[in-house]
Amino acid sequence: KRHSPVLFPIVGKLKRNQTIINGRTYEIRQHGFARDMEFEPVTKLDNFHSYLLKCNKYTQARYPFDFELYNTYRQEANKLIFIYKVINTGVTNMPFGLGGHPAFKIDPDDLKRGNYYLEFAEEEDRTHFLYLVDGLVGTEYAKNKLINNRIIALDEHTFDNDALIIKGIQNKKISLKNSRTRKTVLTMEFDGWPYLGIWSKPGAPFICLEPWQSTADRIHSSNVFVQKPDMIVLEPGQEFEAKFSVQFFN
């Protein structure tokens, strides 16, 4: 089963689930292959766990690059820090996308009744909600769902048209709150991540808050991998690291 999967080497869907790399067509399914692969334990301490995924024949058949992907968790009191590091171990430039997909337990009845909401730490007047067409990013923006430039109301119909994907967030701090209990459930800080995805499966006892470096293909995508918007490109030997944190409240 998937538990807090890492999205790599893509986030979201590719047009026709295919992409072109160096003139050859490859198939990569939604959110990439890393989320379905077993990572090797590297370090296990009481408050620090680190895991590693290395390229192999399976990944090379879908993504012809040499890499190491580290997934690390560090606990500090009631805060959990997620750290992702990608290293280009090959001899050519390596483009990729990266994202987190952690899920957090909620009461599905409270979601159904509209008791949950998300609140940014400050007013956000430059945000845009991406509009998805069969999982691909459309040419127009979706309706802005922010109330008073700060609050996103949540209920059982919030995700009828797939995930909410927000870009242009200035203050990268958001809290999940419950109006019935008048409590803050958690606060996420995601500085350095251009996008935030929000999603829940109908009737599920969880909600996903997903910091992303990139998004799905556009509906008019050329399918050429290096032409995807927001790709991170590492030169041989270079590495990229990004982190976010979640603070939990009783």
Model region roles, listed by residue range:
Residues 19-27, 84, 232-248:
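Short Pro-Gly-centered flexible turn/kink motifs
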Residues 1-21:
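Acidic-aromatic substrate-binding/catalytic surfaces of carbohydrate-active enzymes
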Residues 22-77:
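Extended, loop-rich substrate-binding clefts of extracytoplasmic carbohydrate-active enzymes
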Residues 103-106, 110-190:
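Active-site/ligand-binding surface loops and adjacent short beta/alpha elements
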Residues 178-217:
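Glycine-rich active-site loops that engage anionic ligands at enzyme catalytic sites
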Residues 55-109:
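Acidic, contiguous internal or C-terminal segments within carbohydrate-active enzymes
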Residues 1-4, 210-222:
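Short, basic/aromatic beta-hairpin or loop at an interaction surface
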Residues 70-72, 229-234:
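Beta-strand-rich interaction surfaces with strong enrichment in secreted/lumenal proteins
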